[in-house]
């Protein structure tokens, strides 16, 4: 190749490389800026405050997602990995009516660190037991012993039949490739490098950041365009659909099996010298027309009596108009509920000498 041809080839390659490097620099910078914004706690609090106000205005459900796509992503990818369980605290477990029962993002930071709301949507007592086992085995949960208080928020929904094809928690664990379950149902992290894990978490955080900006925009549009339908308290779904959700003709046997899982959960927590209480969560009066509530609550009372487990009965503590749908509370309802349990929270933290 002549010197002239070599020179032309070099100029061509340089003319291609510089724009490519420039584009790469723009992409990297965009990703870094997005991640920095997504990790900004002040911006996160502003987003949650805006979504809260629009939830009040539109009469919709508020979910504390932080800068993630949903509540559970925030808990699994951000809150739990940064939790310090060595000092003790108070931790709530349950299904969706527990996770959306109260918020803590607007509490003082030094109080937030001792409170965990680990509700998982569409879960049952088996899922709660597996989650607690994971936290103990992988995260050092309950290492503070008597300084820990676990409150199991319960309702008959935790005794439903989980359809494997629509297993929300299983799909949640697999969503980012960070967790999996063993053949016996234990939750374990997928082996990978620290860098790979960090990149996956930050990708989830950045995606959630854009998702929540979209939530703010959509909520603003609904509020200002008069499209809000307001709360829709009342029974959701037909009796047949609810019966299928609870296990069809075998709903009683399934309920018994799930309550047994709750018994095992209580035993597990106590084996680590932690305190445990059961809380019957608020229910609308429309639940009285179903056979599930009365039987489930009867089983829970018997279980608490036989295991000497304190029972906090808040099942009828909220009026129907504090529900946004059949089973979840409005923002005003969440604030009232937090007021009801704050004495329990502060009482334990003061007694344990950690707040």
Predicted regions and their residues:
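Histidine-centered active-site loop/cap adjacent to the catalytic His
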Residues: 3, 325-355
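A generic structural signal for well-ordered alpha-helical segments
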Residues: 108, 269, 303-304
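Second-shell loop/turn segments in exported
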Residues: 92, 117-122, 248-255, 288-290, ...
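Secreted/periplasmic serine-hydrolase-like ester/acetyl group-modifying domain
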Residues: 154, 163-272
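Extended hydrophobic/aromatic segments used for targeting, binding, or gating
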Residues: 276-327, 331
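Membrane-embedded segments
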Residues: 86-182
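Extracytoplasmic/secreted proteins, especially bacterial periplasmic and envelope-associated proteins
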Residues: 127-130, 190-197, 208, 257, ...
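N-terminal secretory targeting modules
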Residues: 1-88
């Amino acid at each position: 190749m002549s010197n002239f041809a070599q020179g032309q080839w070099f100029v061509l390659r340089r003319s291609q490389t510089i724009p490519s490097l420039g584009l790469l620099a723009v992409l990297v910078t965009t990703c870094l800026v997005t991640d920095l914004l997504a990790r900004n706690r002040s911006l996160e609090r502003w987003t949650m405050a805006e979504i809260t106000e629009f939830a009040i205005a539109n009469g919709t459900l508020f979910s504390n997602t932080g800068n993630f796509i949903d509540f559970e992503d925030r808990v699994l990818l951000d809150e739990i990995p940064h939790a310090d369980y060595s000092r003790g605290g108070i931790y709530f477990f349950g299904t969706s009516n527990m996770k959306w029962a109260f918020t803590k993002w607007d509490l003082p930071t030094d109080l937030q660190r001792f409170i965990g709301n680990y509700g998982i949507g569409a879960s049952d007592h088996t899922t709660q037991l597996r989650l607690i086992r994971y936290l103990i085995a992988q995260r050092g949960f309950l290492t503070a012993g008597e300084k820990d208080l676990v409150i199991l928020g319960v309702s008959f929904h935790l005794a439903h039949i989980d359809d494997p094809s629509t297993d929300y928690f299983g799909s949640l664990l697999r969503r980012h490739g960070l967790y999996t379950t063993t053949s016996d149902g234990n939750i374990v992290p997928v082996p990978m490098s620290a860098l790979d894990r960090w990149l996956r978490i930050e990708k989830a955080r950045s995606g959630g950041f854009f998702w929540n900006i979209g939530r703010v925009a959509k909520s603003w549009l609904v509020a200002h365009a008069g499209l809000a339908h307001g709360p829709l308290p009342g029974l959701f779904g037909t009796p047949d659909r609810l019966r299928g959700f609870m296990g069809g003709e075998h709903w009683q046997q399934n309920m018994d099996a799930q309550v047994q899982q709750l018994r095992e959960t209580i035993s597990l927590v106590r084996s680590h010298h932690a305190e445990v209480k059961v809380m019957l969560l608020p229910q609308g009066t429309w639940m009285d027309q179903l056979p599930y509530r009365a039987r489930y609550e009867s089983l829970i009372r018997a279980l608490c009596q036989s295991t000497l487990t304190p029972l906090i009965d808040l099942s009828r503590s909220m009026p129907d108009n504090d529900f946004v749908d059949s089973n979840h509370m409005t923002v005003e309802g969440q604030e009232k509920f937090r007021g009801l349990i704050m004495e329990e929270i502060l009482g334990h933290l003061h007694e344990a000498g950690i707040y």
